[in-house]
Amino acid sequence: INQLNINYLNKIPLRAVSGNSIIAETNFNSNHIINKKISVINTSRKNIHAGSTYHNGFENNGVDKLLNKLDEIIKKEYKVKKINFGIRSASVDREPLVGKHPTIDNLYIINGLGSKGVSQSPYCSKELFNYIELNKNLDKEINIERFIT
C-alpha cells in the first residue's frame, strides 16, 4: 500500500488489490505454469502454490473460492499446508505497466502485474530488455506510456 504513496510512483496508475493463495501438498506434477482463473505451480515434487483470488480492497475471504478452482484444475487430492493473504499492486486496466519512468532518467518499471505476475513477468522482462538494450518498441498493451502521454 505504501508504494502508492512513494513519490516516484505517484504518476503511475496503480491500485491495491488483495487476494488469497495457498501452499498444498499433493502428487500433482507439472513442468508448466497452469493459468485457468488461478495459477498453479509446482514448487517441489510434493508441493504446489495456487493463487490468487482477486478483490478490490482488503478482503480476506477468498479461500473457499480458490479451493473450488483448484479442485477443477488438478483433480487430485491435496492437503493445504499454508493459507496466504496479501496485497499486490495492479494497474487500473489490469494489464502490466512496463517502460521508462515519465520523469526520472534511468528508472524503468515493471509493475501492475497483479496475480498474473508469475506468468507475465518473463515476457515483460524480455520486452523491457529489448527496449533498453536493443532500442525496440514496447508492446503497446503493456507500455506505461498508454497512461502517461
Regions found by a protein language model. Give the residues of each.
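Active-site substrate-recognition segment that forms the wall
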Residues: 2-105
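C-terminal catalytic lobe of FAD-dependent flavoproteins
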Residues: 79-149
